[in-house]
Amino acid sequence: MRVGIALSGDVPGAAERVLEAVERADVDVVVYHNVELDADVEEVRAKDPGRALVEDLVEGRLDAAVRGAVSGRCVRELVDALDLPFTGRSTVLEAEGRRVLLAPVGIDEGWEVESLVKLGELAARFHRRLTRREPSVAVVSSGRLEDFGRRSEIDRWLADGELVARLLKERGMEVEHVGILVEEALERDVVLFVNGVLGNLTFRCLSLVAGFRSHGAPVLAALERGVVFVDTSRAQRASGYARALRLAAELAGG
């Protein structure tokens, strides 16, 4: 079992955080980098560590990969290499001892109802894989339902939330549109936002500010193809990278 992770000298503190994560993860890790490393680790030096990481994953030289501390451009390169319709990233957070999925967390994802419904289905399947039980789903939008009419943008997102929840219910899922009430949504297993900006902002508030433990964000569309890639923020702490490495190994069967 070989799991790759990348770091770039362009990201402040990247080497220190990633190397600490490798020590803590208890996983066989290959570090992709473009800096001088003074560490006893398996390493691949490349001009573009993120691209090299994706190439080795797609070509089967790695069992799984974690983005690590490099530009998010490598996620787009994964999408292109696998010809994916979208990434479908879903962050795995710990909330009161439970694994809760947040999706979408890519700022350019989830802006159409059809893609949100597909992402909800992918996230539900992924949660079943993690927990072996049926998930409950909360759809989060832009206000309380009684806030219709206050502003056209709010109305549109509320309407999208209602429609997504209805369509997922028609597919046999346990779903509720909770409006803007994130505090209620976190009591469910899957939290589905009506666009990726809301999802990304919520992830940053919960994980990078409030200290909720993050295990990274698997690219669910790739996982459906049998390819394990866990996205992470380049600002993540070493402990977060270590959890992402362990999740990647778990998903790859290690």
From Swiss-Prot:
Give the lineage.
Answer: Archaea, Methanobacteriati, Methanobacteriota, Methanomada group, Methanopyri
E.C. number(s) listed in UniProt: 2.1.1.-
Signal sequence residues: none
Q: Which GO terms describe its molecular function?
A: methyltransferase activity
What highest taxon heads this organism's lineage? Archaea
Q: Top EC class per UniProt?
A: transferase
Keywords, alphabetical: Methyltransferase, Transferase
Do you know which InterPro entries this protein is assigned to? MeTrfase_MtxX_xsu
Q: Name one GO biological process term.
A: methylation
Q: What is this protein called?
A: Uncharacterized methyltransferase MK0941
Task: Work out whether the entry's keyword set contains Cell membrane.
Answer: no
- Can you tell me which family this protein belongs to? Belongs to the MtxX family.
